[in-house]
């Protein structure tokens, strides 16, 4: 198949979060399966040009209809670690992608509406006719709308669209001016509940809703999160829309890049290890203790948290887990940063308060090298999220022999299976500890079981860690599932 991914990110050249990693990992897996994959991306001024090989002109002066007139673009082509990427650069006083950042501008809706329009115009004018157009999140939610309402009448009538929702919290809610800009000119037609009208604000359109309504297949990034999106408020008002379109809606778990996250060859570890050489994991623990000036005591399990310090990640439970671990004779290492000033101030205060404690270290910020070493060193990884569409932290922890303690939400449900209580997996397939209520008591019940197993039965704890390492959370299975979805909507 010929597949074109249209997205606002692709790691490592454009990466603001996990979306970029998914775009790159999925594209590579699809190519390994023999498919032709191309990517269309914005040409941000702040992207990592050093990761692009052979950047050159692909299409000069692409004319993109806009507000009854036109904006001209140049399209550049280059290779990003083996992926063929096209970058759209508008020549306009609006400077849509020359802002010094990827997101956060007041006119983000206009910026990405234009990107969607330009991507479709590029496919049309360059005579590219992919079998599948795969779009991601609200930024490209208008692509299937434009394809169906405009471009199918210009020879693009056999393309099928897969639309993946990575985060329901950002949906692209905008006014009617977006419709006029992109050439979707019949307000009464588009401002209807079964098309683009926002489910909460009847005077606004919703990019993500448009993606759901007009695409041939819609998915989110784990099966359980797909269920949550339909039957809880986690979809932020789109639950009824998903119910209407339930026959084309599902969940496909994200994969993990096993070239980056591989304890057998990871150059950022103090000592590489595998299932067969699991004992060498302890050398990473010792190296981390020496680096962070922590006490050396092999009887103490090392717990860790790696991630953003915000409400989505269950920050109040992260904070509680630090003190609970210390009260149970364990060590705790945190690596993360808070974007909200009050949370940042709170954790800086905690860092100062705990600075002289030899069993805890709070590293506020992000350090890729340190993250790898923490994964390699940790015995237990804590993931107490309030909301987790997929989650990669627990997958990396499992890969590196760190037993996860997680809250049973989203993709955590599909990847971590409680050692004591999971009834859907035999004991030899269980790999962690799960709690469900978002409170301190529930967290403590799971943490206490994990810490007690480490202290009281080291052999059983090692067995559990090895069972986690045996799971395959690479892109292999998700890649196959996406191919099956593509083939289904092409049939």
UniProtKB/Swiss-Prot annotation:
Cysteine disulfide partners in this protein: none
Major enzyme class: transferase
Pfam families reported in the protein's UniProt record: Glyco_transf_5, Glycos_transf_1
Example of a GO biological process term: glycogen biosynthetic process
EC number: 2.4.1.21
Keyword terms, alphabetized: Glycogen biosynthesis, Glycosyltransferase, Transferase
InterPro entries recorded: Glyco_trans_1, GS/SS, Starch_synth_cat_dom
Catalytic activity: [(1->4)-alpha-D-glucosyl](n) + ADP-alpha-D-glucose = [(1->4)-alpha-D-glucosyl](n+1) + ADP + H(+)
Gene Ontology MF, one: alpha-1,4-glucan glucosyltransferase (UDP-glucose donor) activity
Binding site for ADP-alpha-D-glucose: 15
SUPFAM superfamilies named in the record: UDP-Glycosyltransferase/glycogen phosphorylase
Pathway(s) served: Glycan biosynthesis; glycogen biosynthesis
The keyword Transferase appears for this protein: yes
Membership in a protein family: Belongs to the glycosyltransferase 1 family. Bacterial/plant glycogen synthase subfamily.
HAMAP family named among the record's database cross-references: Glycogen_synth
Functional description taken from the UniProt entry: Synthesizes alpha-1,4-glucan chains using ADP-glucose.
Protein's recorded name: Probable glycogen synthase 2
Organism in which the protein naturally occurs: Synechocystis sp. (strain ATCC 27184 / PCC 6803 / Kazusa)
Phylogenetic classification of the source organism: Bacteria, Bacillati, Cyanobacteriota, Cyanophyceae, Synechococcales
Gene from which the chain derives: glgA2
């Amino acid at each position: 198949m010929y597949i074109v991914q249209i997205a606002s990110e692709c790691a490592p050249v454009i990466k603001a979060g996990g979306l970029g990693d998914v775009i790159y990992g999925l594209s590579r897996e699809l190519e390994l399966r023999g498919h032709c994959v191309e990517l269309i991306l914005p040409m941000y001024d702040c992207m990592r040009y050093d990761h692009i090989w052979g950047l050159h002109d692909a299409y000069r002066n692409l004319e993109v209809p806009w507000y009854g007139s036109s904006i001209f673009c140049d399209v550049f082509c280059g290779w990003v670690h083996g992926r063929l990427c096209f970058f759209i650069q508008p020549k306009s006083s609006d400077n849509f992608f020359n802002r010094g950042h990827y997101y956060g501008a007041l006119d983000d809706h206009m910026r990405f509406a234009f990107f969607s329009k330009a991507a479709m115009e590029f496919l049309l004018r360059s005579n590219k006719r992919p079998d599948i157009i795969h779009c991601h999140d609200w930024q490209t939610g208008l692509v299937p709308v434009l394809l169906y309402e405009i471009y199918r009448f210009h020879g693009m009538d056999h393309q099928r669209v897969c639309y993946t929702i990575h985060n329901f919290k950002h949906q692209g809610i905008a006014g009617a001016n977006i419709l006029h800009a992109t050439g979707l000119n019949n307000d009464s037609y588009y401002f209807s509940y079964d098309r683009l009208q926002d489910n909460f604000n009847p005077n606004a359109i919703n990019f993500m809703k448009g993606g759901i309504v007009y695409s041939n297949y819609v998915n989110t990034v784990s099966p359980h999160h797909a269920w949550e999106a339909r039957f809880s408020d986690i979809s932020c008002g789109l639950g009824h829309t998903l119910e209407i379109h339930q026959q084309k809606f599902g969940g496909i778990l994200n994969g993990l890049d096993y070239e980056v996250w591989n304890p057998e060859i990871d150059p950022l570890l103090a000592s590489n290890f595998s299932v067969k050489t699991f004992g060498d994991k302890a050398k990473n623990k010792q190296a981390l203790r020496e680096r962070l000036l922590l006490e050396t005591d092999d009887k103490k399990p090392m717990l860790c948290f790696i991630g953003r310090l915000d409400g989505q990640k269950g920050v109040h439970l992260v904070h509680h887990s630090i003190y609970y671990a210390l009260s149970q004779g364990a060590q705790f290492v945190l690596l993360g940063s808070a974007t909200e000033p009050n949370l940042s101030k709170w954790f800086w205060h905690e860092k100062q308060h705990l600075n002289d404690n030899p069993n805890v270290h709070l590293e506020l910020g992000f350090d890729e090298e340190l993250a790898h070493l923490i994964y390699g060193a940790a015995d237990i990884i804590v993931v107490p999220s309030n909301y987790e569409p997929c989650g990669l932290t627990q997958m990396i922890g499992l890969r590196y022999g760190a037993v996860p303690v997680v809250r049973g939400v989203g993709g955590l449900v599909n990847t971590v299976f409680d050692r004591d209580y999971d009834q859907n997996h035999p004991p030899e397939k269980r790999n962690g500890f799960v709690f469900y209520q978002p409170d301190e008591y529930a967290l403590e019940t799971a943490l206490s079981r994990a810490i007690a197993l480490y202290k009281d039965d080291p052999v059983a704890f090692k067995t559990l860690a090895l069972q986690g390492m045996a799971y395959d959370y690479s892109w292999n299975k998700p890649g196959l599932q996406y191919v099956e979805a593509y083939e289904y909507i092409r049939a």
